[in-house]
């Protein structure tokens, strides 16, 4: 699949409020097409190249701003969620068992946060790859060597530095594993399974229709990151994002969510519908 189509697919599968935050690849590609390798202006490194670099710099600044904003939000949410998990696990300090609704809410928040952080890792990977691809096209068309110095600059950009988000994802997965398998959670949810099985019609289907998207998008993002890092012969040494790979779509933590017995209804496993009930 060509990168332009892959990017379009990723934008469509991303969160609605993120869709205008991705690299303006189509606009950059259009500008590259207007550039002629025989143009004295561009060949001399004049206005044509300056315009292209200005657009690239603007895109990098925009991507950085969004990435840093989301990263800061996730740090805060992760800290608050950990405090909530500890409170629920301890029965709020009063020795009581957490209610099923309370445990569902915590599970939902964990899954949402994990999914959104994986989407941010994917956002970094896709935008980095887009920059590398468009610079490769530019150099090929103009005969210039802009890609190497520009990518070296990109390597120092905040959106390219994903160690913090990768660590938050791993921490979140550890919390997910603990909360999904704890005896406290199992006890809290046991009675609620009977209530869930009694749901039918619109009341039973609404949670699935409203909330299953985050899990689907997360798995799609993981698959894309795996593809981008697969070492395709069309990619150069700068084309792979240097991130610590999060869980794969087949990872234990994601499979444990999908295979949770609470999710099984009429022989199928609706994505996360129980946790969003």
UniProtKB/Swiss-Prot annotation:
| Gene name of this polypeptide | SPX3
The answer to keyword Cell membrane applying to this record is: no
Q: Where in the cell is it found?
A: Nucleus; Cytoplasm
In Swiss-Prot or TrEMBL terms, this protein is called SPX domain-containing protein 3
Q: Which InterPro entries match?
A: SPX_dom, SPX_prot
**One GO CC term on file:** nucleus
Please provide the Gene Ontology terms (biological process) for this protein.
Answer: cellular response to cold; cellular response to phosphate starvation
Is Coiled coil one of the keywords UniProt gives this record?
no
What function does this protein fulfil? Functional repressor of PHR2. Involved in maintaining cellular Pi homeostasis when plants are exposed to an external change in Pi. Negatively regulates root-to-shoot Pi translocation redundantly with SPX3. Down-regulates the non-coding RNA IPS1 (At3g09922) and suppresses the responses of miR399 and PHO2 to Pi-starvation.
Summarize subunit and interaction data from the UniProt record for this chain.
Homo- and heterodimers with SPX5.
Lineage summary: Eukaryota, Viridiplantae, Streptophyta, Embryophyta, Tracheophyta
Q: Which residues form the SPX domain?
A: 1-152
Disruption of the gene: reported phenotype: No visible phenotype, due to the redundancy with SPX5.
